[in-house]
Amino acid sequence: MSTENAVVISSSCHRYLKVGQNRGVSPRLLSPADAAALLRPTDTLGLGLGPANPHTFLNALSARDDWENLQIGGALVLGLFGLFTNPHVHYRAGFFGPAERYLRSVGADVQLVPAGFRQFEPVLRQFAPRVMAVQCARDADGNFNTSLHVGATFEELLRAGRDPERLLIVEVNPHLPVTTALEGYTTTIPAELVDVVIEGDQPVFELPEETATEVDETIADIAAGFIHPHATLQTGIGAIPTMVARHLAQREGGEYGIHSEMFTTGLWMLHQAGKVTNSHKSIFPGVSVTTFALGSSAMYEWMNNNPAVAFAPVDIVNDPTLIGRNRHFVSINGAISVDLYGQIVADSVAGRQISGVGGHEDFVAGAELDTQNVSLICLPATIEVNGVRQSRITAQLPLGSIVSTPRHHTAVIVTEFGAADLRGRTVSERAHLLAEIAHPQFRDELHLAAENLAH
């Protein structure tokens, strides 16, 4: 970022500027350390999810050791920062990733706030952090493009920018793409709302591509059979959704649309294969719609100033009523386990958090609003625990399990042994259909359990 449009404030005087004093003019350009010094020992800080993390700023905050009670609201931190291991720093996370799981394992105070992605915005508004910090790209007009993440924080960033009692800090990263907003919406933070700018140079996080197994490929092949040539797609994270996209990219025909909370490398592959036209969508036609993106550096480069992909707030992208208006909509997500009632566990193991609900339930619910649409929940039939094969399809969920998606939203479950279409089926019928796609080792006992299932 050039300093010609920023007011440079030295560390000797910036502490004495009132919050909001610089509003309406160019934002102050500070060093990361000076920006970090603007937070009080007891304070509240809000962060954007994942690719919106301001890495340089978080590293600068990590260098401070005078915290008394710093409360942080965020989700899916992409990196390990010493800040979060400080005993006086308390992190309220709406979604767990590898960093949150690691922090929990080393005794850091990281607490889950159970909420779907759409609920993050009201949760953050209630939290009302005094300081909001975000990583952005600088656009051609000198304003701040939220790049790979709009999500649930955009409105809170603007509120912080308009409030003279609050502080809005933007970290500019030259490696981030400038992305396009969905028509009728904005994903740009005006420069006059920003209090402080710092310069970052962190390489953009690339999501490692999971290696697909033969089981994953079989599941993906079965799932692809449910997808209409003019389908609008949503895919979650993981090897199986990526494999589904690859199957679609390689098979004959296909004029697909994209309406997906997360834009992934798999969806980019579909674009690259010429299989995405967005011409058959009944809402937001002509563009792929998303609210955040994680993938490869090549995907990010492709997204730069590319109008083929449009970003919008999560309350638009994840609205089930809007999702359901797409013709032949197919939602493809994973799960950890499912019981014979069709209850889905997708974000925890025995009550221990490993990820979050995200938009899982929104897209499952949206897909059920039209008989031409379908939600596919894909998972391997078994998992090995300490060398012992266990079924992921169980008669009942273990004590302490947390249901991510209730049975009344469940449509189709796919394993390597087939697909169980539960739509319109009775409790007993659903149970037997699920038993039939379990591993053969467990089918008899599951069918027996299905006979005795309460209904």
Segments (PLM) and residue ranges:
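Conserved alpha/beta enzyme-core scaffold
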Residues: 6-455
